[in-house]
Regions:
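Acidic-glycine-rich active-site phosphate/pyrophosphate-binding loop
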Residues: 3-17, 49-51, 98-122, 400-415, ...
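Non-catalytic terminal/interface segments that mediate subunit docking, oligomerization
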Residues: 325, 329-472, 550-564, 568-579, ...
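Thiamine diphosphate
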Residues: 100, 106-129, 145, 149-163, ...
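Cofactor-binding active-site loop characterized by glycine-rich and histidine/acidic residues
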Residues: 37-189, 405, 440
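N-terminal capping segment at the start of a domain
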Residues: 14-28, 200-202
């Protein structure tokens, strides 16, 4: 490709004007950052990013993460000008564009492919959903970890299949967020030299210049994280940008941060370098003045001059196509020389699991003393991961407690000298862990992350994003209730279950015994487009005798009749529970049965799976004509009224817990068979009284 600075500048200004016009027409959005970063993104894409626009899901492509998601028009403009093809639901390229000019004209409109912040799956070329600042940085660390795992697992001396890089574009807001510290620290420790962050230091936020609230020496901070740092004083300096990108790619022992100083809203004479350029349209007059400053026709909107598409095709497109074709030839040869590895990789790409992946999941014998569900979860996890090589994960420094350490032969630890390890050590960085797990899932691995349920609050943003993106992240949350005991209310989750259940598209499973744990893991692995939380206990739970009670396979339907009235009688009362409280309901059921009272126990490990069942099944489990109902759960009451009705009883937590042995806490808060029995009897009497008055 011939050197042509004038044509390069034309491309840069096209990005700027498309961004201004789109925000102005939508009457909402963020024009300033795309205007500032257009030269940075252009030179990265045109000269360095390895990406074939005709095959946008090519496995060895470089990943570009727009962590500064409010600058979405920057990405949409690039995708349009680079003529990136859209892919169909099966991931195959189509003849249509990922982003058309019409899509840009409908920026931020209902049903468009150009939403206000980039959304994974909605727009081809968007590698991850961003918007909440800092999340893209955490995702990029997970993506870089995945790249290293692919290299370690699949590369052969005669066939180095994988060597892609991950670039993330971030801003002052990203750097202020705590997750950037966690993610950068982890990446530096792991020496992820395939990771390059480009930090737009424009020193302007919504409230004004950053000196109001931010005075960090970012480069010193990152050197302390074991990062290589580079500095570009002017975002419009093409030679300095080129030198920085070349040097960053040459670093082999640590990640790189490139600090770029830009002027937000560059070219807008009255609004550049002010907060007015950040999160609102510039205004018709200011847009015209900015276009005049660029030498642009002031009366043309959504204008792409001749030669711009061709310039992208000659650089970005031609480079990417050549790299992808070279890789495809290597892969074809690899397929012949290493067919088993090639088949494994094909399964990963197809979002499949190996045949027999669940064949070693144990069945647990009845045991009144039982086992903590965190322990049974650890056994099931190891049985699955030993058969699914791309199932990797770890904990926020809690693997010995959450029982998520993979112990099978060859599992190993993922470290800078062993990127093929399956055990990820996230350190005490829950927020970064959640975001990195998303990055791993976006790379088609089947990852998990674990901590105590109480600390799920530290990672709520990435959990929410995993549901928005429909990626199969698995979160293992242990120490799930006041069962934590003496650690007291700071460590006893109360409202966390309700919060997680409130996330659309997130499967929350709280199994009641070891065999339900096994089924919970089956459910979590079954859907490659749904994240899951497996919530388990610290304390032992009795393993129910499945010869007397229903099979745990009912877990797959979210809720099921565990024990029922004899002879098909209509139950006088329904006892429903999750987790550690299930065995309490079984004890009460047996007492009622001994008194000749027809009762039913419903295990409800997953409300959202149950809600996806047909109405006939739901009514068969919870008959509408049975009003006497008792719900038992060591958590907040929110949501249970849906199942017990307005007059049903709830044995739940209405306050925070306390520091004491579990046996005392059960008595204090009413989670004993005696208390639940009384609640059941009161419900039966309430219904009798109501009927006598009818």
């Amino acid at each position: 490709m011939q050197n042509d600075p004038a044509l390069d500048q034309l491309c840069i200004n096209t990005i700027r004007t498309l961004s201004m016009d789109a925000v102005q027409k939508a009457n909402s959005g963020h024009p300033g950052t795309p205007m500032a970063l257009a030269p940075v993104a252009y030179h990265l894409w045109q000269n360095h990013l390895r990406y074939d626009p005709d095959e946008p899901l090519w496995p060895n492509r470089d990943r570009f993460v727009l962590s500064v998601g409010h600058a979405s028009m920057l990405l949409y403009s690039l995708l349009h000008l680079a003529n990136v093809k859209a892919v169909d639901d099966g991931g195959k390229p189509t003849n249509g564009p990922a982003v058309s000019l019409d899509d840009i004209e409908h920026f931020r409109q209902l049903g468009s492919k150009t939403p206000g912040h980039p959304e994974y799956r909605m727009t081809t070329g968007v590698e991850t959903t961003t918007g909440p600042l800092g999340q893209g940085l955490g995702n990029s660390v997970g993506m870089a970890m995945a790249a290293r795992w692919y290299e370690s697992h699949f590369n052969q001396p005669d066939a180095p299949l994988f060597d892609y890089r991950v670039y993330a574009l971030c801003g002052d807001g990203d750097m202020m967020e705590g997750i950037s510290h966690e993610a950068a620290s982890l990446a530096g420790h792991l020496k992820l030299s395939n990771l390059i962050w480009i930090y737009d230091s424009n020193r302007v936020t919504i409230e004004g210049h950053t000196d109001l609230a931010y005075s960090d020496d970012v480069e010193s901070r990152f050197r302390g994280y074991n990062w290589h740092t580079l500095h570009v004083n002017d975002a419009n300096d093409a030679a300095a940008l080129e030198a920085a990108f070349v040097e960053a790619k040459s670093i082999t022992d640590r990640p790189t941060l490139i600090v770029v100083h830009s002027i937000i809203g560059w070219g807008a004479p009255h609004k550049q370098d002010t907060s007015a350029a950040h999160g609102e349209p510039l205004g018709v007059e200011e847009v015209a003045l900015a276009k005049k400053a660029y030498g642009w026709p002031e009366d043309k909107f959504f204008y792409v001059p001749d030669g711009v598409h061709e310039r992208f095709a000659a650089g970005f497109g031609a480079r990417g196509k050549a790299a992808r074709e070279d890789w495809q030839a290597k892969y074809d040869a690899y397929n012949k020389k290493h067919p088993e590895l090639a088949r494994e990789f094909a399964q990963i790409e197809a979002h499949e699991l190996p045949a027999g992946w669940d064949s070693d999941i144990p069945t647990f014998d009845a045991d009144p003393k039982g086992v903590a569900s965190r322990d049974s979860s650890g056994k099931v996890l190891n049985a699955i991961a030993a058969r699914v090589p791309w199932m990797i994960g770890g904990a926020a420094d809690l693997a010995p407690s959450t029982k998520t350490n993979l112990k099978f032969e060859g599992a190993g630890s993922f470290e800078h000298d062993n990127y093929g390890g399956c055990n990820l050590h996230f350190g005490i960085r829950e927020h970064a862990m959640g975001a990195a797990v998303n990055g791993l899932a976006l790379s088609n691995l089947r990852p998990f992350g674990s901590t105590f349920l109480i600390f799920s609050d530290y990672m709520k943003p990435p959990i929410r994003l995993s549901a928005i993106m429909e990626v199969p992240a698995i979160y293992v949350f242990t120490h799930d209730s006041i069962g934590v005991g003496e650690d007291g209310p700071t460590h006893q989750p109360i409202e966390q279950l309700a919060s997680l259940r409130g996330v659309p598209g997130l499967t929350v499973l709280r199994p009641g015994d070891a065999n339900e744990v096994a089924e919970a893991w089956r459910a979590a692995l079954a859907d490659p487009r749904r994240p899951s939380c497996i919530v388990v206990s610290r304390q032992p739970l009795p393993t129910l005798d499945r010869s007397r009670y229903a099979a745990a396979s009912g877990t797959q339907r979210g809720a099921y009749v565990l024990a029922d009235a004899a002879g098909g009688q209509k139950p006088h009362v329904i006892l429903m529970a999750t987790g550690s409280e299930l065995s309490v309901c079984v004890d009460v059921y047996e007492k009622l049965k001994s008194e000749g009272i027809a009762a039913r126990v419903v295990s409800m490990p997953s409300w959202d799976i149950f809600e996806r069942q047909d109405e006939a099944y739901q009514d068969s489990v919870l008959p509408p004509d049975v009003d006497a109902r008792v719900a038992v759960e060591q958590a907040a009451s929110l949501g249970w009224d849906r199942y017990v009705g307005r007059l049903g009883a709830q044995v739940v937590m209405h306050t925070f817990g306390a520091s004491a042995p579990l046996a005392e806490l059960k008595k204090k808060f009413g989670f004993t068979p005696e208390h639940v029995y009384e609640a059941a009897k009161q419900q039966i009497e309430r219904v009798k009284s109501k009927r006598s008055q009818e």
